[in-house]
Amino acid sequence: MKTDIIIFGTGKSSELVLDALKMDNVTVNAFADNNFNKHGTLYKGINVVNPVDLIKMEFSFVIIAIIKYHSVVKQLLGYGIKEEKIVPYFDIDIIDNNKLTDMFFWERMLRDNYNIKIKKIEIKLENLPYESVSIRELYTPEVKGITETMDMLVDTGVSISRFGDGEMKLIAGKGIGFQKASGELAERLKEVLKSQSENHITGILDVFGSLTKYTDGLQDYFREYLHDYNREFQYGLLNINKTYYNAFITRPYISYKDKQHAGEVFESFKKVWDGKNILIVEGDRTRLGRGNDLFNNVKSCKRIICPNENAFEKYGQILGAVKKQDKGMLVLLALGPTATILAYDLAKEGFHAVDIGHIDIEYEWYLMGATEKIAVKNKYTNEAYGGNSHDSIEDKEYEEQVVERVGL
């Protein structure tokens, strides 16, 4: 009799799982995925379902085909699925689970897990010279600390654009989860990255030297990131005569081992908009500041709502919508790579614009004491499993703040 299983995930890693399964012994009833756009479609000829519906289905095991599986385990447990039914494929300790012997070709599982570990070690050794504080002769870009960056924003009123890993991938022609790549987008991002302006600064990732301040998982991620999107490529994009500021100002909590200073950063941000009229330009369902006190000290708040995904395709309309508003307002942007370019263009037009990215979600995680990226109720959380919220809620005050919807 065959064992009925569900495979969680429809990415490249799921192909490794399929390859390692003894198909004579198992039946794949369905794939599950948090991307709601995939629900009801076929993957490898098999139905893709919403993970919420798994509790209604008959199966023996859910095989998690995701390397960073811990949050998925919590998600499934939260749905009421029993722990003994949850099998993270990339958990090395899985080899001790005797009841799975008939399901997998163990040598393939061991090979996959072994290769992942070896790759991490090789990349760590490759990056080690740049992480060593004793080696000074290697060039690394000048990136100011979070405190210095926040002081600039509070004391001088400059505008800021931020570059994360997603923006660099887009420059390299690689799309990211919520934004397709394009030649125009890449060229505009490169323009902002090299720009020099008195009323605008640029934040980049502080990952070119020591990584010890970040969580272990993030250290591994950035080593691999610098390997895949190599240093030489990134250095070629930067202006070596330019001082860069810290893009992590909007991520002061979840990424760091020492989280005790995050509160100071959030308080500094509140000083940026204290007593001001603000205009928030955000994605649909982002709901910046709703349900918390992040903007309780502003004088007034208006919003322009834009698409959560592929917002750059509506760039001209979004820019035009902002330019119709009063230049005396502080413009807060939470729109991925579109915000990076928008802050630069608005600064040239005389607006005060701040790319605040994930600050609201980070603040929510800080308030709840989260230790990993988790979905936040009623807010689009693209980096957390189950975070592609598309629910409808009634929020009269929020709706009254909306002055325009663009591209929706």
What are these regions (language model features)?
Residues 285-328:
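A mid-sequence, solvent-exposed acidic-amphipathic segment
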Residues 38-44, 94-100, 290, 310-317, ...:
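Short, charged, surface-exposed secondary-structure boundary motifs
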Residues 32-38, 67-69, 207, 283-286, ...:
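Short, polar loop motifs at secondary-structure junctions
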Residues 24-42:
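NAD(P)-binding Rossmann-fold cofactor-contacting core
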Residues 341-408:
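C-terminal functional extensions of proteins
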Residues 101-295, 407:
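Electropositive, gly/pro-rich neighborhoods at or near active sites that engage anionic ligands
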Residues 2-21, 31, 278-282:
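Glycine-rich adenosine-cofactor-binding loop
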Residues 36-112:
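Phosphate-bearing ligand-interacting subdomains
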